[in-house]
């Protein structure tokens, strides 16, 4: 995993380069206090105080840096990110303010995925000092979780199959003293028939499995975190075009989010979170491949059966709507343990991207208070989410003539909501449940948020869990 754990350090008065922050409104006054040579240096770099503008200014025998921000008194998570990307390697401190939550973007801006580059440039780490020592460990933990998601999603499917997701869960279990259980083979077909049906056509090296991790005091409130782990999605027999398949290594982005969030929950006592919960992590890990034994349009499979779910039969009307199938079995299993809260992450529908674009995850929740808590936590962390509805009137679109339900209605309407309504059928009545339909990918880079795999909704979920269980 990418290690950037030393980028934020306590300010004990050690030597460091000053960073001044200015906005357009205060730029003229700030500029007047500088020497003619310094003003000329800024003009040569076309620095005018705009957001994300940066410059280096000579100062005696040394120099200082300056960055443009919207409001120097209210720093966002991203306002220092451009500086962290472009400044030379070294140690820095803000001249006037403490960085606050901007330490997040300072760290994530220095992420690079270079695993497959033969001539990858050496890291040039820029260290930021802060006097707010208590904020360092929580910020490190969140940044490491984001970078874990990026690493997992950016890794090609050849090296990030179901076994690799299992390996990451195994690592987490060892680090945090959790119990790990993996179901595969005949036991998977019996216990998780939808997971098996989706993944059975994959090569043996990418065989399907259900990964479960349990951690925490059984007396504490039980929560379940579920992540869609489709390590590559060809679409199955309803095959995707090549353009639609190109990014399908990211279809395990839900699992990446779930694993990263589980790490935050279990490591909370080290990062200031201290969550007192009994955690149940579930990752149905599969590859939706094409072979002679692939599931077919028109096939009918029964989901996992339990006390709260009687093994609903599902007609496969589209093999490319496979993510909701593997999540269905996982949600049934999660509810068997009677959790008070279930949260799932999935790169589930293109419809969510059409509605909200790539940067804003769609969020669905049964309870208004849970939805609002997620929205508030996202706004506080600059990790916005947007609630979409679960309209009862659309449930009839999931009806099938030959089974209890179908996995993908042909009308194409309200795709994200209908997919969430499908999942809702597999969550026990009365359980507080929320669902993230996230893109897990950034097609265009921004300061602190490079192009590629991305954690979207992760920090919102973590903030909500901290507020509720911290």
Language-model segments: residues:
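Short amphipathic alpha-helical segment within the helicase RecA-like ATPase core
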Residues: 1-229
